[in-house]
Regions:
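Flexible, glycine-rich loop/tail regions that form catalytic "lids" or insertion modules at the edges
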Residues: 2-28, 35, 39-42, 90, ...
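Conserved active-site and cofactor/substrate-binding residues in soluble primary-metabolism enzymes
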Residues: 36, 64-71, 114-118, 140-147, ...
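Active-site capping/gating regions of soluble enzymes
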Residues: 212, 228-237, 253-438
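Catalytic alpha/beta active-site cores
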Residues: 1-262, 267, 286, 293-300, ...
Length: 531
């Protein structure tokens, strides 16, 4: 038989696995006959999936001042968005007030600036928080922004037990990938558990943490590493909650996840399926979860920002559409589709609408949501799912051998693995082994940018600085300092900080002021290794 001629020397997934030229029946077919909605939920957590309820269309948005972002939220809701997702700016993410010297030039640039309860009120003015679920992407100072949100609900007479939404609040991935930590790993994990504990007792409909693989993938990991490191972080939080004395079925059903949808279409679908299966089996076998809801992994997906290109930016609409489809075929519970201009600026109003319309076309025109897990039983998809599960389990074992997650962070294990994978990927692009249209092939040498770019006015910095100065003059400073002292004492006594932070928020305490009080007890952290 003559040798087949193929267009490349080898075919690999983005994770680096060699791909066969075709896939046929497997010895593991017993796993493939399980229906959607049945343990271990490989095929989806609901029997009828999107036939019953479509995924939540939750576009990540925030820029400039709370007033400007509030206008954008109302625009998105008017155009059919079904949930809100807050993007904070760098000063807020790092725990600085807008008038801090390190905030200069950064206020409102990559998200909305929120420094106080007053800002939170403006951000959600005219939005019914009992009806709209709100996701907040905040980590280092997550417990502070959470306290602002709860204080706002109470001020508006809302029963907090009715609040729906998600707080990202995933400290561990900050040290691995996002690099926006404030405190050392151990106290940061303690703060995560504080919020989980508070929500389990007071806010049963709220997801207190969104364990995030998205940033791990954006930093350069493979799909297998994203899967493994993310689930491993989830297990680490479970261990801390159990040590606190919480019962597994009192909180596990509110743990949520956040994954990336990259360009390797079938590998991404398999990744989501493997995540559900691993989670269900581990929660049942290791942690003894009995509540069916605890076994069902729920996740949000965002299309891959790192796959977008500044060159020929209109092509990003197509990339995003394929990535969104992989997320839906993989059973995501909510979805953000990136805008075509995000390599160049925060999304313009037009670009944000196109991104939302991409989801709506997928939901209402393609027929994709009409059948649960339509790719289930595909020999290719099932073998990919099995392979990713095996990769993940191998990583779990390595991390355990190193002494657990925090020790592996301090030793630089995750950071080095991600850096190695990022380097391999970039080499494949540089060598043209992997083609990126418009970047290393099909290039337009004389390309001119002709899309609208959103520009953030310097007025955002001035406005936020003026607001915080006015706040400091108008608040009851004596009462605030009394509440700050109680907060400091609670830090030292290892108490749950949420009630103390709500009191500080109500008295006009700012993000930066609160962080400084907490730093004096918890300290700060610096990486002590090189990559």
């Amino acid at each position: 038989m003559s040798k087949k001629v193929e267009r490349k020397g080898s075919f690999k997934s983005i994770s680096g696995d060699e791909l066969k030229d075709f896939y046929s029946s497997s010895n593991n077919e017993k796993n493939y006959n399980i229906d959607p909605g049945s343990f271990p939920y490989t095929r989806g957590i609901h029997k009828n999936m999107y036939r019953g309820k479509l995924w939540t269309m939750r576009q990540f948005s925030g820029f400039s001042t709370p007033e400007k972002t509030n206008e954008r939220y109302k625009y998105l809701l008017k155009n059919g968005q079904t949930g809100l997702s807050v993007a904070y700016d760098m000063p807020t993410l790092m725990g600085y007030d807008p008038d801090h010297e390190l905030s200069s030039g950064e206020v409102g640039v990559c998200g909305v600036n929120v420094a106080s309860l007053q800002d939170m009120e403006i951000l959600f003015d005219g939005i019914d928080l009992e009806k709209i679920s709100v996701s907040q992407t905040i980590n280092g100072p997550a417990i502070i922004l959470f306290a602002f949100y709860v204080a706002l609900a109470k001020k508006n007479g809302i029963d907090v037990s009715k609040l729906r939404g998600t707080l990202q609040n995933d400290a561990l991935k900050e040290y691995m990938a996002q690099k926006e930590w404030i405190f050392p790993p151990e106290p940061s994990v303690k703060l995560v558990v504080d919020i989980i504990e508070y929500c389990s007792e007071n806010m049963p409909l709220y997801n207190p943490v969104s364990i995030s693989g998205y940033h791990i993938r954006e930093a350069g990991s493979t799909a297998a590493q994203e899967l493994a490191f993310t689930l491993n972080n989830g297990f680490a939080y479970i261990e801390e909650c159990l040590e606190r004395g919480l019962k597994i079925d009192d909180f596990a059903h509110r743990l949520s996840f956040f994954f990336n949808a990259h360009m390797d279409f079938f590998e991404e679908i398999a990744k989501y399926r493997a995540a559900r299966r691993i989670w269900a089996n581990r929660l049942k076998d290791k942690y003894g979860a009995k509540n069916e809801s605890s076994l069902k992994l729920k996740f949000h997906t965002q299309t891959a920002g790192c796959s977008l290109t500044a060159q020929q930016p209109e092509n990003n609409i197509v990339r995003t559409a394929f990535e969104a489809m992989s997320a839906v075929l993989g059973g995501t519970n909510s979805l953000h589709t990136n805008s075509l201009d995000e390599t160049l600026a925060l999304p313009s109003e037009k670009a944000a609408k196109i991104a939302l319309r991409t989801q709506q076309i997928l939901a209402f025109e393609t027929g994709v949501p009409n059948v649960a897990d339509p790719l289930g039983g595909s020999w290719y998809i099932e073998e990919l799912t099995d392979k990713l599960e095996k990769h993940a389990i191998r990583y779990f074992e390595e991390i355990q051998e190193m002494g657990g997650t925090v020790q592996a962070i301090e030793d630089g294990y995750f950071q080095k693995k991600i850096a190695e994978s990022a380097s391999i990927y970039q080499e494949s692009v540089d060598s043209k082994e992997r083609i990126i249209v418009g970047v290393n092939d099909f290039v337009e040498e004389d390309e001119e940018l002709d899309i609208e770019i959103l520009k953030i006015s310097r007025d955002a910095q001035d406005t936020q600085e003026d607001k915080i100065k006015t706040l400091r003059k108008s608040r009851d400073e004596k009462t605030l300092q009394e509440k700050m002292k109680k907060l400091s004492d609670a830090c030292k006594k290892d108490l749950n900080l949420v009630p103390f932070l709500i009191e500080v928020a109500e008295q006009g305490g700012t993000v930066g002021e609160i962080v400084e009080v907490m730093k004096k007890v918890y300290g700060e952290w610096e990486e002590s290794f090189g990559i």
